[in-house]
């Protein structure tokens, strides 16, 4: 059974599954039954933490498609899993509902219906919108916790100042920010704050859009329709070449530990911080099981120190960006399913 970690009061497997790829983001999506089977297999091998969002699916299907898929896959084990989903709040919705609380609750009720549940374990504000008070969102989340509709709440792509203000209003269970061997900005302030205040840290894109697996090369051709990797700066040919020394470091440790590059990249962050729970995403069952297997890869303190030193000696070229959810478009395509 996979080791467990805590996101404040939520006990989750050390590695979760990011479910977005079953509905969009990585090109052609799998057949429904394949996706359902993949999530169930992940549960069978010890994963109890599954991450979705109301917006996932809006390009190929419709917003909410991914939540429906996750709900269907895990309905028979609902009490044994921790479901995380996210909302994006627009100012016009707040105005229409008369309050931030009513707007947040309306999103939550819709998500619960799609997930087939009467509560959500972890409810994130997907992105901060400067036109909507995050302080009021934090207060609304507290009311929803008191009503038993959510067990905890979180923020995504948040800075430490905003996090601290929100946490003072309603204690935050988890922060979901980008973090990997190529994206380490959160190590300066956000992760230390989370450690100090008993807040879980849930990295998205922990394998850097697949780059750290070593399977993305200058010859890789991404799919034409709905493949966000086409727009990731780190996956431009010149940056793939320039970041090769990082893959060389990973390859050395993969041989040492009889593991894959992706597993080493996940084991590294698990060793580094006790509150980190990565949620690598994939639409491929083999990759999902490989990623979950990283929980069994244990680095000694000496091995970790050597790996950290080798990484620190490398220069990272390019950045990952937030191509799925750029602020100027994110949430604007929301249409209710007919």
Model-derived features: positions:
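A cross-family glycoside hydrolase active-site/sugar-binding cleft signature
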Residues: 18, 53, 84-86, 123-126, ...
């Amino acid at each position: 059974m996979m080791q467990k970690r805590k996101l404040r009061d939520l006990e989750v497997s050390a590695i979760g599954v990011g479910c977005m790829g079953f509905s969009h983001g990585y090109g052609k999506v799998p057949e429904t039954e394949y996706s359902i089977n993949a999530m169930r297999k992940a549960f069978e091998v010890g994963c109890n933490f599954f991450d979705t969002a109301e917006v996932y699916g809006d390009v190929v299907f419709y917003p909410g498609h991914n939540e429906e898929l996750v709900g269907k896959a895990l309905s028979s084990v609902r009490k044994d899993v921790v479901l995380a989903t996210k909302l994006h709040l627009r100012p016009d919705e707040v105005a229409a509902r008369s309050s931030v609380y009513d707007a947040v609750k309306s999103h939550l009720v819709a998500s619960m219906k799609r997930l087939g549940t009467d509560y959500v374990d972890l409810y994130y504000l997907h992105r901060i919108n400067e036109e909507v008070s995050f302080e009021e969102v934090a207060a609304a989340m507290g009311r929803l916790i008191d009503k038993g509709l959510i067990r905890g709440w979180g923020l995504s792509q948040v800075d430490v100042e905003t996090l601290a203000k929100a946490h003072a209003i309603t204690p935050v269970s988890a922060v979901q920010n980008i973090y990997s061997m190529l994206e380490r900005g959160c190590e300066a302030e956000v992760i230390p704050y989370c450690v100090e205040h008993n807040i879980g840290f849930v990295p998205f894109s922990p394998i850097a859009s697949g780059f750290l697996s070593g399977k993305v090369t200058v010859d890789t051709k991404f799919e034409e329709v709905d493949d966000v990797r086409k727009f990731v700066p780190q996956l431009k040919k010149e940056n793939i070449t320039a970041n090769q020394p990082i893959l060389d470091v990973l390859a050395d440790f993969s041989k040492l530990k009889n593991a894959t590059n992706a597993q080493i990249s996940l084991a590294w962050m698990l060793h580094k911080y006790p509150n980190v729970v990565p949620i690598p995403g994939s639409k491929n069952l083999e990759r999902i099981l490989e990623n979950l297997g990283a929980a069994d890869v244990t680095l000694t303190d000496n091995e970790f120190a050597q790996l950290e030193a080798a990484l620190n000696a490398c220069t990272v070229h390019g950045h990952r960006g937030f191509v799925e959810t750029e602020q100027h478009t994110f949430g604007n395509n929301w249409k209710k399913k007919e």
